[in-house]
Amino acid sequence: KIGDEVRSLADEVPFDIPDSWEWVRLGELFQHNTGKALNAANCTGQLKQYITTSNLYWDRFELDNLKEMYFSESEIEKCTVIKGDLLVCEGGDIGRASIWSYDYPMCIQNHIHRLRAYVPLCTRFFYYLFDLYKHIGWIGGKGIGIQGLSSNAIHSLLFPLPPLAEQHRIVETIDKLQPYTDAYADVESTLDTLNTTFPERLKKSILQEAVQGKLVPQDSSDEPAEALLERI
C-alpha cells in the first residue's frame, strides 16, 4: 500500500508486454503454501521423509541423507509435493526454485513454498521467471528487491502471463539456448581475460527477452492470456 491506497497493477508493471499477454499476481495462478515447521516434541502421525532448502537447488534436488519427522493426516495433505509442483525457497537462498519431477510424492519443511497451478500452465516458464527475478535482484537482492518471500509476498508477486502455447515456445527456446550459456561458463573458468560476468549477463538478457514477449514470434492464433484467466 501507499498510504491508504492500494497500488494498481498499472503502477507496478516494470516493462511492456505484448497485447496478448496479461500482468497477474502469482496467487491468481497458483495455490501456494509452505510445509511443516520442525517440532521435535511431536511424535504422533506418520514418520515421513522431508526436504528443506538445503535439498533444493536451481533446477535440481539433492536427496541424499533426507531427514524424517512426524506428519498428521492434514499435514500430509498440506505439506506433500507431487510431480509438476514448483518449489521455491522462502529462506536460505531466497527465491531459488526447482520443479519436482519425480514420480513419487515428498513432504516439505516450512521454509519451502509449494506452488500448484489452478489451470494448465507451463510450469517451467514460471521457473524461469523466478530465475530471472533472482538474477536481476527483484527477489532476495539488495536495494528495492523483495528481501523475503513470505506467503503474502509470494502471493503478490507480479508476473507476465503469455498465452499457454507461447509459454511452451519460450521454454523450448530458452532450453535450446541454455547449453550456450553453460559453454560460456566453462570458458570463463579457464580464460582469465574473459569477463567473468558475461554468462550471467547473457542468461539475464535471454530471460528478459523471453518475459517481454520478444524471444519467440507472436502467433495471432494463440488463445490470449485473458481467456486463460477467465477459466480460473
Predicted regions and their residues:
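Core structural elements
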Residues: 1-2, 176, 197-212
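Sequence-specific dsDNA recognition surfaces
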Residues: 6-12, 27-40, 54-83, 103, ...
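Non-catalytic DNA-recognition/assembly elements of restriction-modification systems
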Residues: 7-36, 164, 168-171, 180, ...
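Proline-centric
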Residues: 15-24, 113-123, 137-139, 152-172, ...
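Short coil/turn segments at secondary-structure boundaries
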Residues: 39-47, 65, 140-144, 217-223
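A short beta-sheet element
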Residues: 52-53, 69-133, 141-143, 148-150, ...
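Conserved hydrophobic residue
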Residues: 154, 215-216
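Extended, well-ordered alpha-helical scaffold/bundle regions in very large, multi-domain proteins
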Residues: 208-209, 216-219, 232
